[in-house]
Amino acid sequence: MTDPLLRAHLAPEPRTLVDILRATADAHPDSPAIDNGREVLTYDELLDAAQELAAALRSDGVRRGDRVGVRIPSGTTDLYVAITGILLAGAAYVPVDHDDPDERARVVFGEAGVAAIVGTDLVIRSGPAARPDADPDEAAEEDPELTDDAWVIFTSGSTGLPKGVAVSHRNAAAFVDAESRMFLQQRPIGPGDRVMAGLSVAFDASCEEMWLAWRYGACLVPAPRSLVRSGMDLGPWLVANDITIVSTVPTLVALWPADALADVRLLILGGEACPPEIGARLATDTREVWNTYGPTEATVVACGAQLDGQPPVRIGLPLDGWDLAVVDAQGQRVPDGEPGELIIGGVGLARYLDPEKDAAVYAPMPGLGWERAYRSGDVVRFDGVGLVFQGRADDQVKVGGRRIELGEVDSALLGLPGVSGAAAAVKRTEAGNRLLVGYVTADAGFDPKAAAEQLRASMPAALVPRIAVVDTLPTRTSGKIDRDALPWPPPGASRGTGATASGTPDLELDGTAAWIAGHWAAILGSPPSAPDEDFFDLGGGSLSAAQLVSKLRERHPDVTVADIYEHPVLADLAQTLDAMAAPTGRTNAAVSPVPRDTQVAQVLGTVVVRSIGALRWLTWIGLGLLVAHRVVDAPWLPSIAWGWVLAGWLLLINPFGRVLLGAAAARLVLRGVGPGRYPRGGRVHLRLWLAERLVDEL
């Protein structure tokens, strides 16, 4: 009987990401590739822009096999032009989130040895490995090969420094093609689909978002960073932007009403454990919901399971091309149903930039007969249907979908002035949030707020913990720190800030401040102890800020996540809320689905709109026939009147005619429509939709 966990022999045919992009552009040249809400690039236009950037990179000395840094604001078209341009130049892109500290960018680009860095407005500057004497005339176009790297993504490292993981084109393209065999087999993804891009490009799951669109001719729709931070406000955005494909973390999906996903037909979850209620609530006959699993070291996703709402929530079976095994401490397979460490092999195995670490982590597994394998550190069991995630076997954790090595946080804490001992741990709050807490033993003059600022200057926000000062750090009999025994709630999140050991505030608050403090206590694990407490110093992040806003909107409907970032101090936030309009007791507005009659009308309207393109092609054919009759004696060719061809050229090909015809069509369709509010899916909505499509086609 074939082992369902061994699928390396089913790996897709070798090719590169450049091969995939060009094949899609050839098949769907006029389909939208990127729509950022302000501009739309077709696949032809994306390829042209990327080739222009690739040429500029070659002129600046970038050659095939080099690495190029990317640091461009999220949600912009330039970000994706940069990524595709670097790939077309034959180089690998090395992303750093635009919001990360400059020190993080310096470390990442230095460790990667980038030859150039592409920044805002696609400005290119030299990197640490630049070739200033390179001859632009020798910059021949050279496509990447299968063994060349496509991207290098840095993850949290146990030594205190981030680790660079290099993914080759063979790895990446195999992942993209293997996923095409998993999702939506009955109704494959295609040019009509719109894929949300909401993840930071420094997070490897962003690669899944991009290629879920670009593998099939669908449109990538970047979500504004402000909406991603707010969480709940992404729901209406999904509806307004006709999003049909979403890949995200369960924590974010939990903030959206089910109606916000009415048009979503594929929902992919990953990055953290998926609660059972997510699948039960969101899986429908018209929507596939998948729970996926995979470390960066094995190219984004190694396995997945379609959720049907029934427990247990599995991480499923491997992608075609990946091998999985569950082993004991001696590296031998365990019986089905028994827990063990998950080992990954196959075509998706990436590599570390550090050769020593690569050799240690991607080691042979003699007990499996594998020459190279990745030890995940995750404990799973195979229940006969698929793999079930059990937890971690080491000090690596996931918070908000981001993988974190507690050792890296420990090292950063120990580097703070006045700290003599440190240990990071993840604790769960009353609201179910996982909170990263840094416990330190320190001198009497230790300033936690200054320490937090120092950490923010050198680390991504997700790695900056809530700081709690303790007298001693508990240890096991082995002498190692016992992270499980670290106190929660903490005895003091910071000096003069935080809660007592009982979790009660050490300063009485009243009015709006007391009401906010109650929500802070549920979301962050303990209440603030003073009016000058800072939400983010107590461990708040983007997702917990979104949760706080959802609570505050019960009284103050106009509050946004931006208000939390602008007024993180308790007293300041309370004053801001008091200055807002009188509380109204707002409830979340339901997102109405488009009526089926309107959907049918849109399908019929699409046929009419597409016929305009067909007439344009017929005009070109007619023009070709007329020219052929003039230059070739071919009586067998069909004849056509000059008048019809001239009319078609004036209205459907000539730019001035197309503009006039588009304007006239829009005015005719929208005749009588004035400013105002109209129901979603109503006649005015349909007329606006048709006018927009007519103008786009013309």
What is the meaning of each model-derived region?
Residues T76-L87, I404-E408, A514, A521, ...:
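Phosphopantetheine-attachment site and its flanking helix in carrier
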Residues M1-R7, T16-V18, I117-E142, A172, ...:
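AMP-dependent adenylate-forming
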Residues G585-L698:
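Terminal amphipathic alpha-helical/low-complexity segments used for targeting or macromolecular assembly
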Residues D78-Y80, A91-R106, D137-D336, E341-L349, ...:
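Motif- and composition-driven signal specific to adenylation
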Residues G37-L41, G69-T77, V96-E103, G198, ...:
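Glycine-rich loop motifs involved in handling phospho/adenylate chemistry
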Residues D30-V40, V62-R67, G386, Q390-D395, ...:
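Phosphopantetheine carrier-protein modules
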Residues M1-I153, V167, A174, P275-G279, ...:
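AMP-binding/adenylate-forming domain of the ANL superfamily
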Residues H98, G421, K427-L436, M459-I481, ...:
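AMP-binding/adenylate-forming catalytic domain of the ANL superfamily
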